[in-house]
């Protein structure tokens, strides 16, 4: 069952009232990066190598950015602390989709905390203003959790 926004808002610090939706929380853009170079992924993560991220936008310094077709990494401004019995799923806001862009996200595991990063694919040029609400995250209760997230992205 989805955990309502009246509860899930407590997984964040410093939310604006406009971010609290019916059953989820809107997430705001903080930084946008271009991806350069090759990534490497394997079964054990021993060979894992992320490509280079080149920062092209920062909501703390920039007013807006026009993004052309392509793929980008978006880091959100909102710091999340997910409880040990909860998982999160992020989706693009419908306004973003209607403008010709989308986001791709992995599962936000129980115990994850930090500012998530998403892959944004732009099909039609789009202008994004600082702290624009681009995604909505919903949370679900998990039973029989095997453990909590302790990976390299925790706290980032």
From Swiss-Prot:
* Pathway membership, UniProt: Pyrimidine metabolism; dUMP biosynthesis; dUMP from dCTP (dUTP route): step 2/2
The highest taxon in the source lineage is Archaea
| Keywords attached to this entry | Hydrolase, Nucleotide metabolism
Gene Ontology terms for molecular function = dCTP deaminase activity; dUTP diphosphatase activity
E.C. code: 3.6.1.23
Q: Could you tell me which InterPro entries the record lists for this protein?
A: dCTP_deaminase (IPR011962), dUTPase-like_sf (IPR036157), dUTPase_archaeal (IPR023537), dUTPase_trimeric (IPR033704)
Q: What class of enzyme is it?
A: hydrolase
Q: Which reaction does it catalyse?
A: dUTP + H2O = dUMP + diphosphate + H(+)
Hydrolase as UniProt keyword: yes
Q: Which Pfam families does the record associate with it?
A: DCD
Q: Which family does it belong to?
A: Belongs to the dCTP deaminase family. Archaeal dUTPase subfamily.
Q: Which NCBIfam families match?
A: PRK02253.1
Q: How does it assemble?
A: Homotrimer.
Q: What does this protein do?
A: This enzyme is involved in nucleotide metabolism: it produces dUMP, the immediate precursor of thymidine nucleotides and it decreases the intracellular concentration of dUTP so that uracil cannot be incorporated into DNA.
Q: What is the official name of this protein in its record?
A: Deoxyuridine 5'-triphosphate nucleotidohydrolase
């Amino acid at each position: 069952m989805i955990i309502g926004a009246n509860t899930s808002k407590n997984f964040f610090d410093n939310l604006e009232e406009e971010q609290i939706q019916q059953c989820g929380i809107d997430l705001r853009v903080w930084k946008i990066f271009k991806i350069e170079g090759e990534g490497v992924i394997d079964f054990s993560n021993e060979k894992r190598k992320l490509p280079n991220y080149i920062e092209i936008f920062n909501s703390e310094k920039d007013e807006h950015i026009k993004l052309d077709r392509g793929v980008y990494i978006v880091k959100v401004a909102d710091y999340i602390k997910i409880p040990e019995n909860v998982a999160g799923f992020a989706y693009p806001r419908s306004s973003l989709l209607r403008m010709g862009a989308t986001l791709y996200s992995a599962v936000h595991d129980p115990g994850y905390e930090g500012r998530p990063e998403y892959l944004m694919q732009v099909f039609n040029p789009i202008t994004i203003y600082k702290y624009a609400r681009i995604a909505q995250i919903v949370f679900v209760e998990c039973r029989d959790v095997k453990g909590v997230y302790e990976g390299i992205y925790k706290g980032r």
